[in-house]
Each structure stands twice: as structure tokens, then as C-alpha cells.
Amino acid sequence: MNLETIIGLEVHVELKTNSKIFSASPTEFGAEPNTQTSVIDLGYPGVLPTLNKEAVNFAMKAAMALNCEIATETKFDRKNYFYPDNPKAYQISQFDKPIGENGWIEIEVDGKKKRIGITRLHLEEDAGKSTHTADGSLVDYNRQGMPLIEIVSEPDMRTPEEAYAYLEKLKSIIQYTGVSDCKMEEGSLRCDANISLRPVGQEKFGTKAELKNLNSFTYVQKGLEHEQVRQEKELLSGGIIQQETRRYDEATKKTILMRVKEGSDDYRYFPEPDLVELYIDDEWKEAVRASIPELPDARKARYVAEIGLPAYDAHVLTLTKEMSDFFEATVADGADAKLTSNWLMGEVLAYLNKQQKELKDVALTPAGLSKMVQLIEKGTISSKIAKKVFNELIEKGGDPEEIVKAKGLVQISDEGTLRKVVTEILDNNGQSIEDFKNGKDRAIGFLVGQIMKATKGQANPPLVNKILLEEINKR
């Protein structure tokens, strides 16, 4: 029996508003526990929620960027459940009238494009955060009442790789809109995954398992890969799959049962009596639509069509708005686009990944990178020397020209000076000359290396190659 994998994702994104969705409490990350709460957040008797209009604007903006249809009439509902991090014993969410429906995004895996449907996008409030220790459990209510959007995909993904690509694309689009920073490490983006298997050709879905506590996109992919294997073994051996909630354990690289899954009826949804229905007219919709900036796909297409970048470069540069904006500012300052792209995708990304930092955390500026790239273009420094300048720029900042002067890194491009060095190297390496003349091309690389060593890497490489061949041919 051949089985087909069915995957759907539920993504919660914390909106970057200045206050919470139903109260004036601040939303700053990292504050002392229970210092950013109010009687509204904690559900004191007699208090009433007030809807944050900016949260609605942000939700609409995200929904539009995800190609959703925006509701004209929407409302809020109570999702009833008791848990220590939910002091009201209900969560204000949206049940049957979400703010956005029927959206989609396009992903690409192994060179093949695929459209993934988005069932709905709705607004809701976040719960508090529980911390469990050996001595007991603690609850921080700072997160209680934070504005969230939940984005529910269609079950259109067929592999864990497609799920990973969907999350990357979704995160990129949301970051471009500016409604959230989507930092998983700070909890502003969280993902639950639903996975089931069914015989190929069968229309009815199999029984699904929901995966929670997925702390990175990599964990989402790994958790789905393991669950895919687990369910396949169970079904092929004649067993059945229970509808349950599981978590991915990185230590064992397995999914572990948490609880038998509840259905939506268990939450006893009913309309929120303290909030009126919300009417969104065309004027409001168009005002929000006008605020949506250029999104990653459009920017990627522009980089290829107008700037002339290869498709791969355009893809990498537009994955995050931070990198894309940095690239644009560098090129606008006069740097060559392709050379800038090479540095950003090479040295810059390598440094950021190694140091686990973002561009905003380092001293490198678009103006600094632009000036360094222009020094390479003019032949003032070589690419090899530029790496020394780059290390200084990204660690300490400064003016590339001043760094070059202070460290004596100006490229040697005087033909007379280089010819003397080349002649001396050839005089001491007669065997390498013979090897080259006998067809051993590697000998030329050795000689170039000796010349670069003698000039401390400051010789102009193209000029060195030219003079070297001229001098060898004289002998």
C-alpha cells in the first residue's frame, strides 16, 4: 500500500502593536514578570475589553499580503477552557467570522513552484506563559492579552520540506509588511503542525496527529519527518492512528504523546458579549491596502528584471527585509549590485550565521560596505585585502579608506614595482618555470602564491598574472 502524506500548519504571529489587543497594557518583550498586566488582562469582575484598532489594521495588512479575502462583517468569540495561564477561563478569539479567508502563498521546492492555500486568518489574544520547575509552576501574565493572528493553512503540503518552505515564505511576507518581527526565540512566531497519511488516490483524510512545542523551522521539519515514519509503520503493520497531540523531543529525535486531542466543540465557542460586531468598509480596506510595501516576490522579480541579478542572488537577498533593505541602501550609495550581492551572500551571511547575530547587531553599515566595494572596483584594494577591511568594518565600523591607509593595505598596481618582484621570484624558482612550460598548469598557481606572499597579499592579481606570463615567455 502506497501512502500519501497530508500536512497543514497553524501559525500564531504576535503583532507588533504598542499596546495589547483589549487593554492599554504595554507589549515590550523582556520586561520583569507580571509588570505589564492590567485588570482587563487578568479578567477582573466588571471590566470591559476595548478593541485595539491598530491590531485590526495589522491583521488586515497581513491577510491582504497573504492574498486573503477581507471580511466586511467580523466578530469575536469566547473560546472556553481552563488553564493556569488563562486567568479569565476563556480566550477572546474569532470562530465563524474570521477577518480573512481563502488566501494563498507560493512556495518553491527543488525548483518546482506550488501554491499553498490559506483557509483563514483570525485575530485573538495570547495567553500567559507557564514555567515549570522542580519546586512548582510559575505563570507570567505579561504575554496575556498580546495581539495574535492565527494563520491556518489548507492541508496542501505533501512533504516536510514543503512545510519548511511554507514557513520560510510566510515569515518573509509577514516581516515585509512590518506587522511582526516573527522571532521564534521570543515567541512572536509559533507553529503547530497537523499530519496524517492516507492511501494514494483516496480522497478522505486519515486521522491526524498535531505536533506542538516546535521551537524552530528545523524542528518542524524534523518532527514531521519522524511522525511521517511513525504513522507509516503503524498503518502498514495493520494498526490505527489516534487523534492526539504530540511534541517533538530533540534529545531523542522522536515525537512523544502529550494528550488525546480535543475537538473544537470542547471549547464551547459563543459570541463575545462584551464586544460588538466589527464592520470593515471598502474605504478602510483600501487605506490598509495602500500601506502594504513591496513584498518579497515583487522585489525578487525587480532585482532580476531591472538590476540584472541572477535569480538565486535575488532569492537569497529577499529572504529577509533587513538584508534586502541593506542591499538596496548599499547599491543606492554607488556600489556595484553584483559585487555587493556577492559580499552580502558570502562574507556577511557567513559572519552573521557564525556569530548568531542580525545585521542590526553589527557595526557594518550600507555606506561602509558601499565604499569598500567601490575601492575594489577602482582597483585600490584586491578582494583578498578587502576581507581584512571587511573584518574591521563589521566588528568596529569606520571608514574603509581610512582603514586601508592606517593598515597600509593599498593594492600594489605599479607595473615596475611588480615586475621586480616577479623577476626575483622567477630567478629563485627555475623548476617551476620548467614545469609550467612542460604543461603543468599548477606551477603558475605556485608562482602567483609566492608573489602574493612577497607582497603581503597586496599585489594586483590580474596585473601579476599578466607580468608573470610575459616574464616566463622571455626565458
UniProtKB/Swiss-Prot annotation:
Please state what the protein is called. Answer: Aspartyl/glutamyl-tRNA(Asn/Gln) amidotransferase subunit B
**InterPro entries cross-referenced by the UniProt entry:** Asn/Gln-tRNA_amidoTrfase_suB/E, Asn/Gln-tRNA_Trfase_suB/E_cat, Asn/Gln_amidotransferase, Asn/Gln_tRNA_amidoTrase-B-like, GatB, GatB_C_1, GatB_Yqey_C_2, Gln-tRNA_amidoTrfase_suB_CS
Q: Provide the leader sequence positions.
A: none
* One MF term in the entry's GO annotations: asparaginyl-tRNA synthase (glutamine-hydrolyzing) activity
Specify the enzyme's EC class, one word.
ligase
Its assembly, as annotated, is: Heterotrimer of A, B and C subunits.
Q: Name one Pfam family in it.
A: GatB_Yqey
A biological process (GO) of this protein is: glutaminyl-tRNAGln biosynthesis via transamidation
- Homology family: Belongs to the GatB/GatE family. GatB subfamily.
What function is annotated for this protein?
Answer: Allows the formation of correctly charged Asn-tRNA(Asn) or Gln-tRNA(Gln) through the transamidation of misacylated Asp-tRNA(Asn) or Glu-tRNA(Gln) in organisms which lack either or both of asparaginyl-tRNA or glutaminyl-tRNA synthetases. The reaction takes place in the presence of glutamine and ATP through an activated phospho-Asp-tRNA(Asn) or phospho-Glu-tRNA(Gln).
Organism whose genome encodes this protein:
Bacillus cereus (strain G9842)
Q: What is its EC number?
A: 6.3.5.-
* Source taxon at top rank: Bacteria
Name of the coding gene: gatB
